[in-house]
Every structure is written in structure tokens, then in C-alpha cells.
Amino acid sequence: MYVRLTLADVNEGEMDNALEYVKNKVIPSYDGISGLLGIAACATNDGRFMAWSTWANEEAKEASIDKFNQALAGAAEMLDGQPEVMEGPMVLDNNISQYPRKAKMDFLQDSF
């Protein structure tokens, strides 16, 4: 498995808009993307925006990076500067991986 993590400073008053953008634009744009396991975003305890996507492998992430960049381009006006991107191999607890993707996404959608 592979993860891409993005941290960004958000312009004052734009955090809710940034989270709504991910919920309403970014997540739906990835529906049906091969190798994508999930996308999520949150506000951190220090006021930064954090988003992550999990992939079956690095190749799946690389195959959709252009679409990812296009989807995030609309959020640029909400950000204060360039986001910090980190990525690499990850491990996952078997408990979460046993749930169907649809069930996990319904849970995450309800949390916004």
C-alpha cells in the first residue's frame, strides 16, 4: 500500500471551504479510479489542512497524479502558500481493510 499526505496552511476563514471542496469536488472526481483505496481530509489541531489518499501501490498513485493535481487546482485560492506533500509505503491494520470501500466512504462522508 502507498499513501500521499498533503499539509497546507489555509487562508483565514477558509478551512470549512477547503474541507467542503474535498468532500464535494475531489472525492467524487476519484470515483472509479483504479488502485485508489480512499481519500480523506481534516483540520489539524494546529489549524492546518491535512489530506491523504491511500493507494494499492505507488504505480496506481502515479497513474492518476495528473487527475489529482487537476482536482486540487481549484483549492489553490484557499491556501496560503504551497502545500507540503509527503508520500511513501504504508501499513494498515487488518480490521479497517475488512470493510467494503463503500461502507468506509459512507462513514467518512457522514463525518464532514
Report each predicted region and the residues it spans.
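Short S/T/G/P-rich N-terminal loop/turn motif that feeds into the first structured element of a domain
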Residues: 1-50, 56-70, 76-112
